[in-house]
């Protein structure tokens, strides 16, 4: 087991997969004449500093906010920070951002004031990870006039998603619940 640990340390120190992956993306973008924003989230944040909205970086997952009180009750954060400019990710050349809704999800807040027809439950795919908001699943469904809320969050699994469904179903009473299950990480 020591040799496996040493191998992991060696790979971590001497082989930076993330860096190689980024270089490949930059190379492909250049070949396709795509202007790729290479700024880090911190550099992007510094560029928009002074904005009236608070900024939060995506990646604060549910496990970071599990709290127990003295009665052994567990409090679990179901969404992100509400009504906040969220810097999400950059996988395809631009930094994806959105203003979260009143419950911290990637929805236009005014949708909560409508009769909801559909809710989407899932992980980063439903969240709209690294996709412009007008291209994500819920925006596409909304563009056809079917009021839809997305309760997708990257890094969540079926139990967390069930908790989201139990909490927000009663607020929305939709006609349809559409559950996205991804076999590779759920």
Regions found by a protein language model. Name each.
Residues 1-11:
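Hydrophobic membrane-insertion alpha-helices, especially the h-region
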Residues 92, 118-119, 127-186:
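Conserved SGNH/GDSL esterase-like catalytic core that processes O-acyl groups on lipids
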Residues 12-15, 180:
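Hydrophobic or amphipathic alpha-helical targeting/insertion segments
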Residues 10, 39, 64, 185-186:
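Intrinsically disordered, low-complexity regions of eukaryotic proteins
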Residues 12, 84-86, 97, 148, ...:
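Residue-identity detector for threonine
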Residues 19-143:
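Membrane/wall-proximal cationic-aromatic binding patches
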